[in-house]
Amino acid sequence: MRALRPLLVALIVLVAPPLASAETVTLDAARRAALAELPALQGTKLNAEALDGRVVVVAFFASWCPPCHPEFDNLNAAQRTFQRDGVEILAVNIFERIGRFKDDPGRLDRFLKRKAPAFHVLGDGEAVAELFGSVDRIPTVFVFGPDGRPTLHFIHARGARKTHVSFEELAVGIRAALGAPPSVGG
């Protein structure tokens, strides 16, 4: 055991700085204000003050992203389920015009028409994505409680089998943010 101690200390020194520097993203006043500045693609203009003290879901997506399609269905289901609880769902469009995807300007409109989101959809979110921990993978979803602390953070990892957050996972995160038991029933 004594021989392993230097190795263990070295391992802690190598691993501890990244763990200590990892910042938990919260939905603070600056992030709420930045979200409110984004153009509304679907729904009404967002009011930052209306997000104060509420459970807020923030989902980053692009219309060309295959996992974002079923995730939008789950966001719609969450909207129907939790609307009476005052939950706000915001979908933030990022990476829409990159690479070969910039050649189809009508793709986003077709996506929104097909998915018919019953929640706020905001455009031009690249700068806001930086405020949420440099979102560089989609879909990425956060659920924030009324205090602004996250109860769920999902990132679609490259090559992962799990490609998007399920309705059940959203429901557990939202219920935790609401202070309710984590059951997944409607």
Describe these PLM feature segments.
Residues 6-17:
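Bacterial N-terminal signal peptides
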Residues 21-48:
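N-terminal "domain-start" segment that seeds a small globular fold
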Residues 54-55, 70-93, 113:
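Conserved helix-turn-beta segment immediately C-terminal to the redox Cys motif
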Residues 55-56, 139:
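Alpha/beta-hydrolase fold active-site loops
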Residues 60-77, 100:
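Conserved redox-active cysteine motifs that mediate thiol-disulfide chemistry
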Residues 86-102, 117-126:
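Thiol-based oxidoreductase modules, predominantly thioredoxin-like and allied folds used
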Residues 106-144:
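Short, internal strand/loop/helix patches
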Residues 143-186:
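Thiol-/selenol-based redox modules, centered on thioredoxin-like
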